[in-house]
Design a protein with these regions (language model features):
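Phosphate/ATP-binding catalytic cores across multiple sugar-kinase/actin-like superfamilies
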Residues: 1-4, 281
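Residues immediately C-terminal
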Residues: 9-10, 46, 283
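C-terminal transmembrane module of polytopic membrane proteins
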Residues: 112, 173-176, 196-289
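Hydrophobic residues within well-ordered alpha-helices
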Residues: 13-14, 61, 249
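Membrane-embedded transport module
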Residues: 1-2, 24-218
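Acidic, divalent-metal-coordinating active-site segment for phosphoryl/phosphodiester hydrolysis
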Residues: 7-17
């Protein structure tokens, strides 16, 4: 319960309320000290606007977290595959850092600039006990979006080996020599290209994910692709970084990457719509429309 007041006699009610709101212009010093919030312009419409912005901030944090956690799952899956399939890791540590501290940063921050969603003021108040990271968010991030990205990344890894004439049994036989860096130069070159493909696929999938995360409820077709231009700026910087990591000789040595064939780059174009369409279908299924 929120209570507004401006006089000395309102102080007890302002203290007892869940949220005490004192008038900034006409309110007394006693009322302002007793309140939780001071309404600087004495305009009650500002309270409504503040609530709407507060809900937008809460929603945007959830969008940000969904986006980040999804890529974490995609980064974790290659190491599960290494353990259970006895293959070399499809990502190396510095490539994971390139995603977490490089390519993911600006698109994630752009989600924090999303405007309040339509109908957000029609939703009931959240319970105090409701966690920010609840089960539906974690399931969506880890078990749906992240799992799809991880499977796509592993698909890219195996695709590079397959196009070079290796099946999974042969890859398992090479695992020990690759991990010890004792494999021949040709094998190591293929391995670096395969991990680079995994890295690029996950980054490309995150482009679809950032649009999917713009709303937990609404379709991207309703929101529009160009209503948050910061996302496009983030994607542009993201691809400048990832292409530099892939094609710069200096960065290749640091991140253990290799130049990708043009045909591999064309495959990356399929990744964003794969993630976005899958989440659009999930939203439609949940809404029942």
């Amino acid at each position: 319960v929120a209570v507004t007041g401006d006089g000395v006699n309102d102080a007890p009610a302002l203290r007892a309320a869940n949220i005490g709101i004192a008038m900034g212009i006409s309110g007394t010093d006693v009322a302002r000290e007793a309140a939780d919030i001071v309404l600087i312009d004495d305009n009650f419409a500002t309270i409504v606007a503040a609530i709407e912005q507060g809900r937008a901030v809460y929603q945007n944090i959830r969008k940000f977290m969904t986006y980040i956690l999804a890529s974490n799952m995609a980064e974790f899956l290659p190491f599960l595959a290494m353990v259970f399939l006895k293959i070399p890791p499809a990502l190396v540590i510095l490539q994971i850092l390139a995603i977490d501290l490089g390519t993911d940063m600006l698109p994630a921050l752009a989600l924090g600039a999303e405007k309040p969603e339509a109908g957000s003021m029609e939703l009931p108040p959240r319970k105090k006990s409701q966690p920010l990271l609840d089960l539906p968010l974690l399931l969506r991030a880890y078990c749906f979006l992240g799992l799809l990205e991880g499977l796509a990344g592993m698909g890219g890894f195996f695709f590079v080996w397959w196009t070079n004439g290796y099946n999974i049994t042969q890859l398992q036989a090479l695992s020990a020599s690759i991990l010890s860096h004792s494999a021949n130069a040709t094998t190591m070159a293929i391995y670096y290209q395969a991990t680079t493909m995994t890295l690029a696929v996950i980054v490309a999938c995150q482009d679809g994910n950032v649009f999917a995360c713009r709303s937990e409820r609404f379709s991207i077709l309703r929101l529009g692709f160009f209503t948050n231009r910061l996302i496009w700026a983030g994607i542009a910087v993201e691809w400048f970084l990832i292409l530099s990591i892939i094609y710069s000789p200096t960065l290749q040595k640091i991140f253990s990457t290799a130049a990708l064939k043009p045909s591999y780059l064309l495959i990356l174009l399929l990744c964003p719509p794969l993630i976005l369409i899958a989440d659009e279908l999930r939203k439609r299924f949940i809404s029942g429309t």
